[in-house]
Structure formats: structure tokens, C-alpha cells
């Protein structure tokens, strides 16, 4: 039997065994093979990491901002040099195709690049003459120990949304990565240390509920950034805020793609197919629902079916694979339950991903699944499935399509496929979502713009990334002086 390592926590620049005896297997989702074991760390482990980060903050906050930036530039270079290995590790523990993993690493590197602009990002503001002989200035400062709680679906990109910018702003950080994808977090911590980051500035504590609750209860944690499911996001937001912490919690999604009759169907079908089935549908920007004008619905459905049938399913490390597995057997069973629900509630199942056979595989595969004639009363329209399941709703016109999309309790993203400038303006003004796309499938912004939406897709005031991220990780002091 292959010897499987049990991961350690990263505290104060050292790899330290958890005080917990509980561990959880980490399988390769494409094969079922156990590749590591992750400790379900205790509150004691978490408190030790926070205390270490608090002590490191005393000196890190006083490090000159340009020096912090130079460390981040070295870190960026190391990530670039290790790009392929990082991408393979993402695929190994998450299951997405190597091509998608390679792109995810790129997005993480871009986040570090943005954070390296800290000398500009941290600038304050001054007004020399607010009154005769009186001037006033705003100065930015770090806030202390930040905690990040990240999901399994982007083990590289989402942590890189958080800790590089927080650290660039002078904070110290405790990261709790998903227990389902813990390997990548350890690797990027190693590279940050190699780049010259002082011990204690970045710490990693593996685990589940006990670590999360420890973060929320620890008074030395000043802010919490979270990305994950809606129920957990709501819990974290309410609990952290009640404990006086600054909090941003990015939650679920049910993104609608609206297709008008004047759309270029060739490019539209390719965009929707990639957005719906890429990363096995396990992303908050996935295309979950297509809302199409009746005049082109039949043709669109036929083309989507043809495109889905051409998808190669398998181990993401194999050449040419587009669709990998979902993350765990339990998530596969949950997805199959939603497919059965769609059938029972009367949707037309035009492609059944349950029938895709992956030869000799013990992995957690679900093939591309497409439902037509979906209505708002159905669970497959209402719930975030987080899997390669696409629902199609037929409507008469753009306003009905917007009405359908806005009826969702989620408001993360939405897309419009059209050649009409008037329709684009109407869509922009009337749609209730935070990230909008026109003639593209995944309108995720770059690191210098804020990420996230509204309603049950986001809890908080300041979004991740961009200027919002800088605001979240800093506090302001106003100095008014008479001379």
C-alpha cells in the first residue's frame, strides 16, 4: 500500500503537527486514489496560529511598503517558475483539466502582481487648505490579523485573492484552505517563504468546523474573508459581524445567460458550453441557466447538444480532456439527485450525464447534462447545483428573460448574447447581478476590479479584489492640523 502523508499546519514558518488525532482522506477525484490525509485541526491549533500572526504583525506592519512589494515581486516570479507544477497539483486534488488549472494559476499570479502595487494602493489623500491655516489628510494603515477561509473549487486563485493583498497592506494572515484541496495551499506557502516573507506573516491551519468557529470567536482576528456556499457564508457573516469583525462572505450563484434571436449562435454555443461544463460546473461563475428567445430556442438547443456530445470526459491530467470529475462521491450523488428531480418535475432531459461511461474509472464523474423546458418552480432552476447541469428556459423577449433572471435569490453574474446596443444597455440597467458579460460566458473581472454580486451571492459591504480589497484590508486615520 502506498505510504500517504498526513499534512501539517504551517505556523511561524514551521511545519507543525496538529494536536488533533482526527484526519480526513484527500482522494484524487479522477481516480479515487488517496493522495494525502489532512488533519482536522483544533481550536488550540488555530489559536496558536493567530497568536503567531499577532506577534508577527508588530514588526511586519512597520516594514516599508516598497520592501513588502519587492517580496511580492519575488513571489510572483517563483510562482511563474513553478507554474506547471502548481497546475498539475490543482488538477490532482481538484480534478479540473490541466488546461483549466493552468489558467487558474495564471489568475493567481495576476492577483499577486496586483498586490505588488501596494505603494500606490496604500496612498492616502491630503487637502492643504480645508480652512485658513488648517490642513487635513487621510492615512491608510493595516488592521491586524486577517483570516481567510477558502473553497475547494479554486485552490490557487481564491487564496491568492486574499493573502497577497492583505499582506501587501501590512497585515498578517491565517489561511484555512478547504480540507478537500489542502495540498496547493501548502505549496504556495513554501514558495512565499522562499521569496523572503518573514516567518509568522502567513500561517495555514487545516481543518473544518472547529477551525472556522475558532476564527470567528478569536478576538485577535480583526477581519474574515470567506468564499463558499450560501448557508455557510450567511453563518460566517452573521457570526463574525456579531463578534465585531470586518467580514466579506462570497456565496452561491445561479448565473443566467440570456440569448436573443440576433445572437451569433456559433460563438454563443461555444461560450455557453465552456461556461456551463468547464471545471465540472463547480464555480460561482458557471452558466447554470440559459434563457433563450423562443424564435431561436430549437436551434440553440440542438447546437448545445452537439457541442456537449463532443466533450471529452476523463482524468484532467490526460491530453485532450475537457471535463473532469466533481470533487467527491457525495457531491456526485447529490448531483444525480438533482437530475432525477428535474425529470420528476417535468423538465425535458435532452442529455443525461448519468449515462456517460468512463472506462475503468473509480472517479466521481458526471457527464454534461442539459434540461430543456425548465420553469421557475423546479429545483434545478432554484438551487445552486454546482455541477455540469444546464437548464434551459424559453421566453418571448428580453424583458421576460430579465424577469426570470432577477427572480433568482442569487445575483452573482449574468450574460447576454446579442448584437443590439439597445439590448445591451437595457440588460446593463435592469439585470440584478454584480458581474455582467456580453457575448462571453464567464465575466469574471481581473484582480484590479472588485469581484462578486448581490442578494444571496454576497454578504458584506466590500467585495474581493480591486479597490474594494484595499479598503477591506486597511483602516483610515484622519489627521487635521493647524499651523
From Swiss-Prot:
Domain of life: Bacteria
Gene Ontology process terms (BP): inositol catabolic process; thymine catabolic process; valine catabolic process
Catalytic activity: 3-oxopropanoate + NAD(+) + CoA + H2O = hydrogencarbonate + acetyl-CoA + NADH + H(+); 2-methyl-3-oxopropanoate + NAD(+) + CoA + H2O = propanoyl-CoA + hydrogencarbonate + NADH + H(+)
Keywords tagged on the record: NAD, Oxidoreductase
GO molecular function: malonate-semialdehyde dehydrogenase (acetylating) activity; methylmalonate-semialdehyde dehydrogenase (acylating, NAD) activity
Residues engaged in binding NAD(+): 152, 176, 179-180, 229, 384
This protein's pathway: Polyol metabolism; myo-inositol degradation into acetyl-CoA; acetyl-CoA from myo-inositol: step 7/7
Enzyme Commission number(s): 1.2.1.27
Record-linked Pfam families: Aldedh
Entry annotated with the keyword Lipid biosynthesis: no
Active site: 284 (nucleophile)
HAMAP family (alphabetical): IolA
Function text: Catalyzes the oxidation of malonate semialdehyde (MSA) and methylmalonate semialdehyde (MMSA) into acetyl-CoA and propanoyl-CoA, respectively. Is involved in a myo-inositol catabolic pathway. Bicarbonate, and not CO2, is the end-product of the enzymatic reaction.
Stated family: Belongs to the aldehyde dehydrogenase family. IolA subfamily.
Assembly and binders: Homotetramer.
Protein name in UniProt: Malonate-semialdehyde dehydrogenase 2
Organism of this sequence: Bacillus mycoides (strain KBAB4) (Bacillus weihenstephanensis)
Gene behind this protein: iolA2
